[in-house]
Amino acid sequence: MNPNNTGTIEINGKEYNTFTEPPVAMAQERAKTSFPVREMTYFLDGGEKNTLKNEQIMEEIERDPLFNNDNYYDLNKEQIRELTMERVAKLSLFVRDQPEDDIKKRFALIGIADMGTYTRLGVHYGLFFGAVRGTGTAEQFGHWISKGAGDLRKFYGCFSMTELGHGSNLAGLETTAIYDEETDEFIINTPHIAATKWWIGGAAHTATHTVVFARLIVKGKDYGVKTFVVQLRNINDHSLKVGISIGDIGKKMGRDGIDNGWIQFTNVRIPRQNLLMKYTKVDREGNVTQPPLAQLTYGSLITGRVSMASDSHQVGKRFITIALRYACIRRQFSTTPGQPETKIIDYPYHQRRLLPLLAYVYALKMTADEVGALFSRTMLKMDDLKPDDKAGLNEVVSDVKELFSVSAGLKAFSTWACADVIDKTRQACGGHGYSGYNGFGQAYADWVVQCTWEGDNNILTLSAGRALIQSAVALRKGEPVGNAVSYLKRYKDLANAKLNGRSLTDPKVLVEAWEVAAGNIINRATDQYEKLIGEGLNADQAFEVLSQQRFQAAKVHTRRHLIAAFFSRIDTEAGEAIKQPLLNLALLFALWSIEEDSGLFLREGFLEPKDIDTVTELVNKYCTTVREEVIGYTDAFNLSDYFINAPIGCYDGDAYRHYFQKVNEQNPARDPRPPYYASTLKPFLFREEEDDDICELDEE
Amino acid sequence: MNPNNTGTIEINGKEYNTFTEPPVAMAQERAKTSFPVREMTYFLDGGEKNTLKNEQIMEEIERDPLFNNDNYYDLNKEQIRELTMERVAKLSLFVRDQPEDDIKKRFALIGIADMGTYTRLGVHYGLFFGAVRGTGTAEQFGHWISKGAGDLRKFYGCFSMTELGHGSNLAGLETTAIYDEETDEFIINTPHIAATKWWIGGAAHTATHTVVFARLIVKGKDYGVKTFVVQLRNINDHSLKVGISIGDIGKKMGRDGIDNGWIQFTNVRIPRQNLLMKYTKVDREGNVTQPPLAQLTYGSLITGRVSMASDSHQVGKRFITIALRYACIRRQFSTTPGQPETKIIDYPYHQRRLLPLLAYVYALKMTADEVGALFSRTMLKMDDLKPDDKAGLNEVVSDVKELFSVSAGLKAFSTWACADVIDKTRQACGGHGYSGYNGFGQAYADWVVQCTWEGDNNILTLSAGRALIQSAVALRKGEPVGNAVSYLKRYKDLANAKLNGRSLTDPKVLVEAWEVAAGNIINRATDQYEKLIGEGLNADQAFEVLSQQRFQAAKVHTRRHLIAAFFSRIDTEAGEAIKQPLLNLALLFALWSIEEDSGLFLREGFLEPKDIDTVTELVNKYCTTVREEVIGYTDAFNLSDYFINAPIGCYDGDAYRHYFQKVNEQNPARDPRPPYYASTLKPFLFREEEDDDICELDEE
Ligand SMILES: Cc1cc2nc3c(=O)[nH]c(=O)nc-3n(C[C@H](O)[C@H](O)[C@H](O)COP(=O)(O)OP(=O)(O)OC[C@H]3O[C@@H](n4cnc5c(N)ncnc54)[C@H](O)[C@@H]3O)c2cc1C
Ligand SMILES: Cc1cc2nc3c(=O)[nH]c(=O)nc-3n(C[C@H](O)[C@H](O)[C@H](O)COP(=O)(O)OP(=O)(O)OC[C@H]3O[C@@H](n4cnc5c(N)ncnc54)[C@H](O)[C@@H]3O)c2cc1C
């Protein structure tokens, strides 16, 4: 009856309609996957053992009634704050009892299902703990553990760095810590409102203690910003300590589960021992010892950046799974009259919108793992360092420097990439992507702060760009540089490299393309830098002039890193059965990256205009190839429906049924009249018009 | 005392600190503007009369207690829905009493301050009304007006097009309207769950009537999708009519003020007269007359698109104002030791992040006005059309076609641009951009649905691209084409044009650059199209193969349109005093657009690699120039603090004071213990550990 044949689909002689077909279509799609999905999961997780552990933890979370997320998207700020507190309490028990690696896995999984809880825990275990461990002595760390910081008993720490007037520029913080020699105390003070500590996660409701960043002032001399532990609330009744004012920062774009607050200190006295003294020391007489390298002090800040690269993969995989599953069951428009409508995944344009993002999400994982491992190795070295081991110290210092710049670029571009994935996958789901119950809106609002906190992405990128130029300068002087920029050494051979008819599907050639592009940008910027210095500018001024170039350098260098790490991980770790499917993704990622930035390759002369056509054809080709196994690729992420938490992205593909059901469960059919019917709607809609009450004038 | 000199600033011999300086800095910045801001406002508003009217309406809104937005960002879904209803009721009174132009102005202004209210009104006055006026006869229109549709008395209309399973593909909708000759009625029915009307704004709480898109079936023959008016609720008690089921769609990413619902029809009988019969007619005997051109039926859909281009400007100007004002008072990092920290607006990189967006927001206005005028002219022609005026009909049909494709591309790229403006300006404000009280989060969540509804942006773009290829095909056959693509006529002269040493600051050259780029893309795609047709594909199939090219074509063509319209409006309307400031913006916009898409111009050979360096230098140069007068450019938008609704973006620049105050007003200092202290926090944080209760075994 319907000439557009939109309603009915025949599969193996059986008829389905728009409502009943999706799960059948999903089963068909799933059957297309030719590679062993389970093996892909092991590859992604770094081995079967990890997969099994993840699955165990996922089950524990899902079964716990406290982690039921059925009404997650309908909670208001007050409700989500309380629930988050309960979840934090529950999770802290695991921290006490379980091995560190399991805890990390659990947190990472929670981070997919409930970003607020993840962060509220992170405020204490990541930021507070990290600062005390990273900048306190072993004795100090032990002291705060003995007070309850280890298992959150009579203790909850927060991290007071940012002020209303200062964020990125730590050196500009204005809170003061003046040493009072008479009493052997520091006096912590907020000089004016713009120096109020601001945004402090955990401060508004939870924290009993905080690490404070404040200017150390001894005998009138300002030693710059150092870290101190300050007690905020009295133990047991949770009232504020004398001299502490705290307010609630209230509504945020997202992450309402975290109780961000502001803190003002009014001449709060703390014992001298509360200065965290691993690097900076003040003795009873007010003698001050400064650290050998400022960056060591902030080493703990790297932790967050490294884990954000990994979070970007975790959250990205959730949303690319939803959009690709939906694309496999959603039909819209028929391209051939009389034929059923086309699945949107079969539109070449839709493939181009989503499949490069799938490849990107895979790529993020490889690089995050690589940098994560580098980070762990460096931290171990740092912990093992003997106080008088000069050579060892130098090595650690240079590793930390490398980590700083690598993690800066990676944090920035991964968190942006993930934001982009959430945004683009939402749009790829049309109107249903805008439903609260499919999770995109909430996740975007929660996610994007990752681009701002723990190092604003733009500032990180600029500083990564600065480090790249510094490396090039070092190389020119014959000094050693870190691994991440070692390709710059071969720069002279690369500078004028061209494709020259070589294959654009050869990983080596693709990596080379990116090395040429990155190398040229960095070296051109370095030329300019040296010229500016020659003209008498100081380093800061010269870098300022080159900010746009620094951004570009960091961008292209980081993309190179992602591409190289992807190919290299396939090379070293992928079994035969999954090698080709992984290569297809990696090639798609590298080629699409070139297409997106084609001006770069044309400009550098590595490619000619006709090569860009080839790149486009290849992107199309790999889209077509990857499209066939999208369900395999996304199933390999191994997220259960609990973690997906979006009815249109359910495993079984029965999207309309789950979605309709979800909407109705959360909004049970009640009175067709809204709650404000009597108060507002009725008096308006069913009003009687009043006559204009004009007094008649006797004008005759 | 502070070697970084971050805290204090000296201005005219007087010292200010981080907290007190901002308003002084703002006054200084404001004084820099060299052009007459008021004249710029007139230019933007299209004349002094419009400005005065806008100001009058703004004052009326601001003073109305019902429109007080002090706690806007803290309202939950239930509260915002009720408030929105009250505001809709209030605004409907203006619709009754005021001239159409004033109403439009009022709605547009409301759209800046409260997008939900704007849309909830729009559901009736835009969508329902538009459909009845556009596809009903004059008698039918009059009938529904007489029922109360004109002033929302005992009448509230909604618009039921989309179904759970179908959105963009109107032709695939599955709701049926079967003509029952016996009773002279249509029977409206929802055949299965996926055919449930979905997303219908106003359905859940408010609507008494709806326009339904349903398949017209007469004597077993399916005539495709037509529009019908159906009553949903009984008048006076607001209960559901027999056969109507309605549910609440609940939580959305944003726009919670609108009561979107789903509707199922179970054999609902409506009189034959409820088919909207301007184009499609069914008589008593079941004879069906079809319209001359399907597109005329959907002509009313263009209204929304045209106004969305204008909305993009309206909302974009609010957020670019906030970010630029903040950038003028926020200091972070000192570039020269001992000097005060730098205002972030003075970082070249920050200028590049924001100033091209400022130019973009200006550009949107020029094009939106131009297309708006074209639209009004066409609608007038359409209304004046005599039934037997063949020539007139042809002209209108060709105008409507042109409007369809122009408005499609413009709607897509403007709404995306505005989303980008909100997102990037938020990031430019660092952490404070994430505060609920600065409005970015709410606005983004509310805004982005504009990219999806009333024509999904991607689909619109593809269809605009299709129209461009069709125009090129027509041109090749010597047929006439619309104004918007007339530059394709000169294509042969342009195809191989190069910059050839001409100035990149000559508007003519810049417009030519974009015409060459757009022309080449369109013509290459047209070559491919003709080749595919030659190979035996039908048009749909050929267009499918060329989807990526269609997207590119629409993108570049639309950018050309924005650039050309900007220069031309300056040329024809700007007085001397504001000409240069406007040109600076337009040049920045055109040059930055080239830089962003440099691959395009290199590929087409219009520019050479060294020209790209010139473009970059010029972008830098115009950023520096425009930077000096940013406060003037943004003040010219003439939005009061009420419409800005972001303390960090206030007119007086006293950002920290307003922000601190706002946060504390909305979150008054109460108990330092959270509401869930007794229930959740205390039992956890102050728990006594239980001993592990292990039964001792007598194992000896
Ligand atoms: C939800 C949330 C939770 C947070 N939790 C905590 C917490 O628990 N503890 C804590 O201490 N902090 C916390 N923060 C603060 C966060 O770390 C800062 O917001 C972040 O570091 C950015 O600093 P800022 O906001 O001061 O931005 P700014 O440094 O003021 O930057 C503003 C803008 O200017 C640009 N800019 C600045 N300097 C330069 C330059 N030199 N060159 C070019 N551009 C420049 C930036 O890119 C940015 O766009 C939180 C923030 C948020 C939003
Ligand atoms: C908040 C809200 C309010 C709304 N209010 C109303 C209302 O009052 N009345 C009403 O009738 N509707 C309403 N809508 C529905 C809205 O108009 C539709 O969601 C919109 O038209 C998109 O249709 P869809 O969701 O079915 O997406 P689909 O058409 O299913 O598209 C899904 C995805 O597939 C892609 N795609 C589809 N076809 C193709 C193709 N041929 N080629 C390439 N890609 C393709 C699209 O780009 C999109 O990314 C509302 C929606 C929302 C979110």
Swiss-Prot record, chains A, B:
Pathway: Lipid metabolism; peroxisomal fatty acid beta-oxidation
Primary localization class, coarse: other
Gene Ontology CC terms, in alphabetical order: peroxisome
Family annotation (Pfam families): ACOX, ACOX_C_alpha1, Acyl-CoA_dh_M, Acyl-CoA_ox_N
Example GO biological process: fatty acid beta-oxidation using acyl-CoA oxidase
Keyword set, alphabetical order: FAD, Fatty acid metabolism, Flavoprotein, Lipid metabolism, Oxidoreductase, Peroxisome
MF (Gene Ontology): acyl-CoA oxidase activity; FAD binding; fatty acid binding; flavin adenine dinucleotide binding
Top-level lineage group: Eukaryota
Reactions it catalyzes: a 2,3-saturated acyl-CoA + O2 = a (2E)-enoyl-CoA + H2O2
Coiled-coil region list: none
Subcellular location per the Swiss-Prot or TrEMBL entry: Peroxisome
Transmembrane segments: none
Assembly mode: Heteropentamer composed of five different subunits.
Family according to the record: Belongs to the acyl-CoA oxidase family.
Function per UniProt: Oxidizes strain chain acyl-CoAs with a chain length of 10 to 14 carbons. Also active toward the 2S isomers of acyl-CoA-esters containing a 2-methyl group.
PANTHER family: ACYL-COENZYME A OXIDASE-LIKE PROTEIN (PTHR10909:SF352), ELECTRON TRANSPORT OXIDOREDUCTASE (PTHR10909)
Protein name: Acyl-coenzyme A oxidase 2
Organism encoding this protein: Yarrowia lipolytica (strain CLIB 122 / E 150)
